[in-house]
Amino acid sequence: MSNAKDNFNVADLTAALNAEDRDDLVNVLKNKLQGLTGKHSNVLENLSPNVRKRVEVLREIQTQHDELEAKFFEERAALEAKYQKQYQPLYAKRSEIVNGVVEVDGEATQTAAADEEEDKDSVEKGVPDFWVTAMKNNEVLAEEITERDEGALKFLKDIKWSRIENPKGFKLEFFFETNPYFTNTVLTKTYHMIDEDEPILEKAIGTEIEWHPGKCLTQKILKKKPKKGSKNSKPITKIEQCESFFNFFSPPQVPDDEEDIDEDAAEELQNLMEQDYDIGSTIRDKIIPHAVSWFTGEAAQDEDYIDLEDDEDEEDDEDEDEDEEDEEEEDEDEDDDDEDEHVTKTKKKSSAGRKRSGGAPAADGQPGERPPECKQQ
């Protein structure tokens, strides 16, 4: 997966977590939780009786909060489901216009430019390249879409999402016209969540794409000329996985044997799954509900504006820190100047004293004594 931060390739993703792997994961989590519980118990035991009582009351308050939060999540899900149904007629109308099924109402004012484009408009239906343009204008998705992908994504007619209940999660559906790349008319991506209210991914399942011969976008064929003098004169052909948006339909796979995966590989796998979920949630939460704004680029500008505000806030904080540092340095410089001035005055006084005394040592060794800096010379 082409992510600038992690530099992982989606081509390495192939399948979903199986039941055995999930059981192993649950056991590991249980062991960790037991260890954490022991640590928490030690914390409470180390508290004084009065403080421990207060903490116990705080825990009861937290339990009440968690119950309210659970109720909030439940009501929010019901509210989202209610409005999701009301969105559907709007999405259906959008799809009809985008795909040229219906024409918009009203007559446009005829101009000379419109006359020149009339023949072209009569052939051009709907809004060409609507979805691929919208997706490319999103920063997260733009990193996944290659030039080779664009040809296939031009046949994308619509994208829909829906909740699934058993197990909890959501499903994305990509509807395609008949195209020269693959035979599927619908590609799906399903996310199973451990907790619907929190983005904790259990597994993801994608459609197996049925590519036409020589049209697979997730692989590239490398041909290497045989070495001179080789008996085989035919070029050597090698197939390699390559970056492509369509790798999105091949989610990560955990090895059957957990011993085959080390800590670094496990961390990489986790990052891949997080990136995969990020792509899916971006399509669900941003592209589908605000598709025309992404098509025109307005949504991207809004995001850039928000990012710019955040950057300005960070710069302001940095400037304030720098100003404070400058003030501290100025104060230190002033202190140094005061010290230098004091030393100069001391030297002048000492010189005057030596002139008056003729430089002779005093009887007690103090009035005619040289200043400390002179002793060190």
UniProtKB/Swiss-Prot annotation:
Offer one Pfam family short name for this entry: NAP
Main localization, broad class: nucleus
Q: Which residues form the propeptide?
A: 375-377
Where do we find the motif Nuclear export signal here? Answer: 47-62
SUPFAM superfamilies from the UniProt entry: NAP-like
Coiled coil spans: 26-80
Disulfide-bond pairs as recorded: none
Q: Which InterPro entries match?
A: NAP-like_sf, NAP_family
Where it sits in the cell: the answer is: Nucleus; Cytoplasm
Q: What are the Cysteine methyl ester sites (modified residues) in this protein?
A: 374
Task: Please give the Gene Ontology molecular function terms for this protein.
Answer: chromatin binding; histone binding
Free-text comment on this protein's domains from its UniProt entry:
The acidic domain is probably involved in the interaction with histones.
What is the annotated role of this protein in its UniProt record?
May modulate chromatin structure by regulation of nucleosome assembly/disassembly. Could function together with B-type cyclins in the regulation of microtubule dynamics.
Q: How does it assemble?
A: Can form homomeric and heteromeric protein complexes with NAP1;4. Binds histones H2A and H2B in vivo. Also able to bind histones H1 and H4 in vitro. Interacts with CYCB1;1 and with alpha tubulin.
Q: What protein family does this chain belong to?
A: Belongs to the nucleosome assembly protein (NAP) family.
What is the name listed in the Swiss-Prot or TrEMBL entry for this protein? Nucleosome assembly protein 1;3
